[in-house]
């Protein structure tokens, strides 16, 4: 990694921390940040004023937005390399549809909620991991070069059909909860909820980071990588599982927030090039920045006088849609 790449990663890491810090100031109600932080760090909860309580509500969602954005952007970069498809996203293999199906089962059938408030994220996570394992199993049995992609698309349709069936059978109250889930949210209740995806993100990154040089070789040519001693099949399976864990861990707690895993890796490549040693860390920090800013727009935007925030999934789609069209035009 050259000096310019190191400087870029350092700048992005500092920028992400500064943006996260200052994002706590803004919302429908502005606060005196320094006073709120002073009380939050030095006074017991019972002595906090309104500003500090608002800070305590905003901080978990900023943490969750940073983790979710970083994980989805990293997973998107890995998926684009492994599938050799610049339009691949973390949701290409059906993980988001499977996660939504698992969460919707709990919302539609409260009897399944045996784990309390953690039931919906847990079922979502299990369904996502099941989808990922099925994709790998089916693709390993296929002799087609595009077997992995086709298996993912097929399961995406199947779980999507399951989602539509559950929504059709749900009552209006359950349907409203499902709609909120589909729009995505980083509205974490507390810091424990905000950091709940962290173990899955840590496991995913622990598999990806030691294999960055292998990603460079896989991106160039798999046959040459195999000739150089890279265990191509094993590494591809491990990296797919890692990116799946990143995605599943996030979707279970935020719902499917689109375009982050597509937009951020392409934007970062304009500055880092194709080397994954710079691309992966830069994607993580840039994804965190993008998601924090999207959440900031979401919670400061009021539409048609409604006393509610704009769903973050709508914000990312508004930004990501035109970028997607631009990417298609450039590819043509």
Can you annotate each of these PLM segments?
Residues 1-332:
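Alpha-helical transmembrane segments in inner-membrane proteins
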């Amino acid at each position: 990694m050259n000096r310019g790449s190191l400087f870029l990663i350092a700048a992005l890491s500092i920028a992400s921390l500064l943006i996260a810090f200052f994002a706590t100031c803004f919302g429908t109600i502005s606060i005196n940040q320094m006073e709120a932080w002073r009380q939050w760090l030095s006074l017991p909860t019972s002595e906090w004023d309104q500003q500090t309580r608002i800070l305590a509500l905003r901080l978990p969602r900023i943490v969750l937005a940073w983790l979710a954005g970083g994980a989805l952007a990293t997973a998107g970069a890995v998926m684009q390399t492994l599938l050799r498809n610049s339009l691949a996203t973390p949701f290409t293999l059906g993980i988001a549809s499977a996660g939504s199906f698992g969460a919707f089962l709990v919302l539609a059938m409260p009897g399944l909620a045996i784990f309390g408030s953690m039931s919906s994220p847990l079922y979502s996570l299990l369904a996502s991991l099941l989808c990922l394992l099925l994709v790998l199993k089916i693709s390993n049995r296929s002799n087609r070069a595009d077997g992995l992609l086709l298996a993912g698309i097929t399961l995406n349709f199947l779980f999507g059909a399951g989602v539509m069936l559950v929504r059709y059978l749900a009552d209006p109250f359950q349907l409203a909860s499902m709609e909120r889930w589909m729009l995505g949210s980083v509205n974490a209740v507390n810091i424990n909820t905000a950091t709940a995806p962290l173990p899955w993100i840590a496991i995913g990154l622990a598999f990806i980071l030691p294999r960055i040089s292998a990603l460079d070789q896989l991106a160039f040519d798999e046959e040459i990588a195999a000739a150089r001693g890279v265990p191509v099949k094993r590494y591809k399976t491990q990296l797919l599982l890692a990116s799946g864990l990143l995605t599943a861990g996030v979707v279970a707690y935020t719902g499917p927030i689109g375009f982050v895993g597509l937009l951020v890796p392409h934007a970062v490549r304009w500055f880092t090039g194709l080397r994954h040693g710079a691309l992966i860390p830069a994607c993580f920090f840039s994804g965190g920045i993008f998601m924090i800013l999207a959440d900031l727009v979401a919670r400061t935007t009021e539409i048609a006088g409604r006393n509610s925030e704009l769903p973050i999934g709508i914000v990312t789609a508004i930004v990501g849609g035109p970028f997607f069209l631009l990417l298609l035009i450039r590819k043509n």
